Structures are given as structure tokens and as C-alpha cells.
From Swiss-Prot:
Essential cofactor(s): pyridoxal 5'-phosphate
Transmembrane segments: none
Role summary: Catalyzes the aminotransferase reaction from putrescine to 2-oxoglutarate, leading to glutamate and 4-aminobutanal, which spontaneously cyclizes to form 1-pyrroline. This is the first step in one of two pathways for putrescine degradation, where putrescine is converted into 4-aminobutanoate (gamma-aminobutyrate or GABA) via 4-aminobutanal. Also functions as a cadaverine transaminase in a a L-lysine degradation pathway to succinate that proceeds via cadaverine, glutarate and L-2-hydroxyglutarate.
SUPFAM superfamilies (UniProt xref): PLP-dependent transferases (SSF53383)
Protein name as it appears in the record: Putrescine aminotransferase
Catalyzed chemical reaction(s): an alkane-alpha,omega-diamine + 2-oxoglutarate = an omega-aminoaldehyde + L-glutamate; putrescine + 2-oxoglutarate = 1-pyrroline + L-glutamate + H2O; cadaverine + 2-oxoglutarate = 5-aminopentanal + L-glutamate
Pfam family of the protein (one): Aminotran_3
Any one Gene Ontology molecular-function term assigned to this protein's record: pyridoxal phosphate binding
Gene3D superfamilies: Aspartate Aminotransferase, domain 1 (3.90.1150.10), Type I PLP-dependent aspartate aminotransferase-like (Major domain) (3.40.640.10)
Similarity-based family: Belongs to the class-III pyridoxal-phosphate-dependent aminotransferase family. Putrescine aminotransferase subfamily.
Entry-annotated residues carrying N6-(pyridoxal phosphate)lysine: 300
Pathway: Amine and polyamine degradation; putrescine degradation; 4-aminobutanal from putrescine (transaminase route): step 1/1
């Protein structure tokens, strides 16, 4: 028998949640009750699969620690009052830290004025953010489309490329093996993991994948497409593959791809959703090779870990296909005043505190420590790699990676794997992580590996 809707039940549940939001602290019994509720509601109303996914942070059979609040810029606190150094960074959203006061203040001040735009009148912050990004991004990137997430920014990039290249008879897209560009239908067509793709086949036609970092494979694909009349509209890739396992291409790869795009008349789309906003030691990872894309995708850290926002920035030549009809691609909430306030404040913090340079310095320190551990534990660790504050430790098998995440959780350091490479644990902390916290992370990793070796020897 179908369950009947209950206004009384919905009202009670929402009132209970609002009461929790208003409380600054919870006592021990309230914390325990909240844990039970959250686990039950995830199981019954969100997705029980998420509980199994969080098995590396299982505590006392509770499936996962329940997050309660930020502890400081670089830590978070669970409902048990335990504080964790954040080396996951919400998959790359906390570049300026948790609840950065500059970002929070900007959003609060805008909230006091007007949280969402009317849609009909011109909204000032969208204009100011677009101008700021035009100044900040490399090359001739000039016009911005704002949305709510990384996958939406990729969708916009693909549609822009299609609209620009269709009159030229170019319809094919080339992406790379191991790529992750999102899970909406268009972005998923560029993503390269079968687990995510197969349930939704057939995906959009016209997408080909070549090995990442192999410039000859890219040239061959462009040549073959030209020979068969399947001319390439755009090449889409990440400067560093994040979900693929933090895979760095050979030096000069992006430069060579840019030259091939120019040679074959293809647009270059760079997905910097994870590598952008200072993460790799430059504001944008493409700046390490002074490469200028035709379209740039941003999201994650753009909202300062406070608001969700994505952006697709393109050259005037490409973006002009939307000039005659700006309603060809729009979104209700994209570029709203609250998200734009957060993004403007985030950029201000990144620049004023020179966080990209800090990411390079502290990233080198962390990576040196992880590489030393790889030399000390070759039976467990295959490799440590990365750039700036985007790093990965790859283990010899999947289970060891899971065990490492669990041991780090016991050491009160939060890490997690990557979506496309189960052997790899990602290290992606806030760029505001202190030197002392960097040292604590390395120390925790050493303790975790030592405990794992003992477990292996005793097995």
C-alpha cells in the first residue's frame, strides 16, 4: 500500500532540523541521537550505498563519523567532538579553508541585501565577478557563464564548442583515458570510467578517448578524424587528472596539445574544476606551461567552500555564438548574488594571501615527506606524486589504500580515495594548512604505515 503524505510529519522533521541548526553545541546524548538519526535517514531516504562507501571512517559500527562543524580553517569536528585535520578538502572545495571569515562575511553581507536575483534586472555581482575572472584568467578568455557545479560548467563548455563549431562541420570531441569531467549526460560522455558510463549507455555520440599524456596518440586521433570527415570540434582534458589518481602528464604535454588544436582548428577546453584556484601552485594549472585555452571550466574552490558555483570562461570569438540569443543556455540559480559574493571574496583571499605560492611551498614539503615514506615502505606504497597541494599516494593494491585511509582516520587526519583509481589515496588539504599541520600529517602517515606493516606481518 502506498504511503500517504504527512504534513505533520514533515513539519516535525523540519522543525527538529531547524532547532539543530540554531544550536551552537549539543550535549552527549543529543550527539548520540543525532548520529543514529543521520545514519537511519541516509539508509532510508538518501542512499544506503553511501554508508558502505564511508566504511574507511567507520567508528563503532556507525558506518561513518557524522560531521558537525568546522573546527578551524583547516579542521573539522564530528558529533563526538573529535577534531580532524582535513586532507581531503571536500574533494577540492576548501582552498581558502573552512568558513574563511572573509568569504563568510561577504555572503552574510549580501544575504542582508538580496540573496537571489530577480532575473529581469541586471545583477551587479555577476558583472563584477565576470570582469574579475577576465582579468584573472590567462590569454583572451573574456566572457563568463555561471552555474552551480563542475559538471554544469563542462556541459556549458561542450555546448559552446558545439555551437561554435557546428557551422564549420566539426562535431567530434576528443577526451582522454582516465578523465573525469562529471556525471551529467554530456560531461559523462567525456568521462572515461566504465562504472559510471555503462548504466547510461548509449551516451552522446561523437566522443573519442585517447591515452592521457600521449601526444602522438592525440595527433593520430586528430588525423584519423580528419581523414574520415569526423572533424574535431574540441579537445577536452584536465591539466592534471584528479579523479584518475592525480596523474601528471609529461612536461610540455599541454603545450603540444595546444599546438595540435591550432593545427587542426579544434578548440581547447581545459577542465580546471579541481586544479584551478591556486591548487597546484599557480592560480590555474595551465599557467605552469603558459597555455591559453579557448574555454576554461571552474567550480569547486571558486565558491570558497561556502557557496556552490561553477564558471565557464571563453574567448570572445567562441562566446559570441550566444550574443544573438543569450537564452540558448541559461540556469535559474547560476551567478546568483550569494555565490558571486563568495567567489569574489575567495579570489580576494587567494590573491591577498598569495595562497598559490603557499600551495607550492607546502605541497613540496608534504610531497617530500610522502616520497620518503614510499622509500621506507616499498612493500605498501607504490608511489607518491603530485603538484602543489594536489597529491596522491598510490598503494600496491586497493585494500591497502582503504586500510591507510582508515588508519589516518584513527590518527585524526581525513583522507579518501579517488573515483577512477581505487589504489590511490588523495591528499588535497586547504591551501591554508599550516607548516605545523603539514608536519603532523606526515607524522600521522608514518604511524599509519607502521601500523599497517605490523598488521601484514601478523596476518
Amino acid at each position: 500500500m502506498n504511503r500517504l503524505p504527512s504534513s505533520a510529519s514533515a513539519l516535525a522533521c523540519s522543525a527538529h532540523a531547524l532547532n539543530l541548526i540554531e544550536k551552537r553545541t549539543l550535549d552527549h546524548e543529543e550527539m548520540k541521537a543525532l548520529n543514529r538519526e543521520v545514519i537511519e535517514y541516509f539508509k532510508e531516504h538518501v542512499n544506503p550505498g553511501f554508508l558502505e562507501y564511508r566504511k574507511s571512517v567507520t567508528a563503532g559500527g556507525d558506518y561513518g563519523a557524522v560531521e558537525w562543524q568546522a573546527g578551524s580553517l583547516n579542521t573539522l569536528v564530528d558529533t563526538q567532538g573529535q577534531e580532524f585535520i582535513d586532507c581531503l578538502g571536500g574533494f577540492g572545495i576548501f582552498n581558502v579553508g573552512h568558513r574563511n571569515p572573509v568569504v563568510v562575511s561577504a555572503v552574510q553581507n549580501q544575504l542582508a541585501k538580496q540573496p537571489l536575483h530577480s532575473q529581469e534586472l541586471l545583477d551587479p555581482l555577476r558583472a563584477m565577478l565576470a570582469k574579475t575572472l577576465a582579468a584573472l584568467t590567462p590569454g583572451k578568455l573574456k566572457y563568463s557563464f555561471f552555474c552551480n557545479s563542475g559538471t554544469e560548467s563542462v556541459e556549458a563548455a561542450l555546448k559552446l564548442a558545439k555551437a561554435y563549431q557546428s557551422p564549420r562541420g566539426k562535431f567530434t570531441f576528443i577526451a582522454t583515458s582516465g578523465a573525469f569531467h562529471g556525471k551529467s549526460l554530456g560531461a559523462l560522455s567525456a568521462t572515461a570510467k566504465s562504472t559510471f558510463r555503462k548504466p547510461f549507455m548509449p551516451l552522446l555520440p561523437g566522443f573519442r578517448h585517447v591515452p592521457f599524456g600521449n601526444i602522438e596518440a592525440m595527433r593520430t586521433a586528430l588525423n584519423e578524424c580528419k581523414k574520415t570527415g569526423d572533424d574535431v570540434a574540441a579537445v577536452i582534458l584536465e591539466p592534471i587528472q584528479g579523479e584518475g589518481g592525480v596523474i601528471l602528464p609529461p612536461p610540455g604535454y599541454l603545450t603540444a596539445v595546444r599546438k595540435l588544436c591550432d593545427e587542426f582548428g579544434a578548440l581547447m577546453i581545459l577542465d580546471e574544476v579541481q586544479t584551478g584556484m591556486g591548487r597546484t601552485g599557480k592560480m590555474f594549472a595551465c599557467e605552469h606551461e603558459n597555455v591559453q585555452p579557448d574555454i576554461l571550466c571552474l567550480a569547486k574552490a571558486l565558491g570558497g567552500g561556502v557557496m556552490p558555483i561553477g564558471a565557464t570562461i571563453a574567448t570572445e570569438e567562441v562566446f559570441s555564438v550566444l550574443f544573438d540569443n543569450p537564452f540558448l543556455h541559461t540556469t535559474t540559480f547560476g551567478g546568483n548574488p550569494l555565490t558571486c559574493a563568495a567567489a569574489l571574496a575567495t579570489i580576494n583571499v587567494l590573491l591577498e594571501q598569495n595562497l598559490p605560492a603557499q600551495a607550492e611551498q607546502k605541497g613540496d614539503m608534504l610531497l617530500d615527506g610522502f616520497r620518503q615514506l614510499a622509500r621506507e615502505y616499498p612493500d605498501l606504497v607504490q608511489e607518491a606524486r603530485g603538484k602543489g597541494m594536489l597529491m596522491a599516494i598510490e598503494f600496491v593494491d586497493n585494500e591497502i589504500g582503504y586500510n591507510f585511509a582508515s588508519e589516518m582516520f584513527r590518527q585524526r587526519v581525513l583522507v579518501a580515495g579517488t573515483l577512477n583509481n581505487a589504489k590511490t589515496i588523495r591528499i588535497e588539504p586547504p591551501l591554508t594548512l599550516t607548516i605545523e599541520q603539514c608536519e603532523l600529517v606526515i607524522k600521522a602517515a608514518r604511524k599509519a604505515l607502521a601500523a599497517m606493516r605490523v598488521s601484514v606481518e601478523e596476518a
